[in-house]
Curated annotation (Swiss-Prot):
Name of the protein: Phallacidin proprotein 1
Gene: PHA1_2
Mod. after translation: Processed by the macrocyclase-peptidase enzyme POPB to yield a toxic cyclic heptapeptide. POPB first removes 10 residues from the N-terminus. Conformational trapping of the remaining peptide forces the enzyme to release this intermediate rather than proceed to macrocyclization. The enzyme rebinds the remaining peptide in a different conformation and catalyzes macrocyclization of the N-terminal 7 residues.
Keyword Cytoplasm attached: no
Record family assignment: Belongs to the MSDIN fungal toxin family.
Cross-link (2'-cysteinyl-6'-hydroxytryptophan sulfoxide (Trp-Cys)): W12-C16
Function field: Major toxin that belongs to the bicyclic heptapeptides called phallotoxins. Although structurally related to amatoxins, phallotoxins have a different mode of action, which is the stabilization of F-actin. Phallotoxins are poisonous when administered parenterally, but not orally because of poor absorption.
Organism classification: Eukaryota, Fungi, Dikarya, Basidiomycota, Agaricomycotina
Crosslinked residue numbers (Cyclopeptide (Ala-Pro)): A11-P17
Organism name: Amanita bisporigera (Destroying angel)
Cross-referenced InterPro entries: Amanitin/phalloidin
Prodomain residues: 1-10, 18-31
Length: 31
């Protein structure tokens, strides 16, 4: 499921800008 989530990340990120903003910060900090 983690692999699928990673592949779908960009897809749902664009679909959910509200949640994407929060995840974007996590990704930026992670990388």
């Amino acid at each position: 499921m983690s692999d699928i989530n990673a592949t779908r990340l960009p897809a749902w990120l664009v679909d959910c800008p509200c949640v994407g903003d929060d995840v974007n910060r996590l990704l930026t900090r992670g990388e």
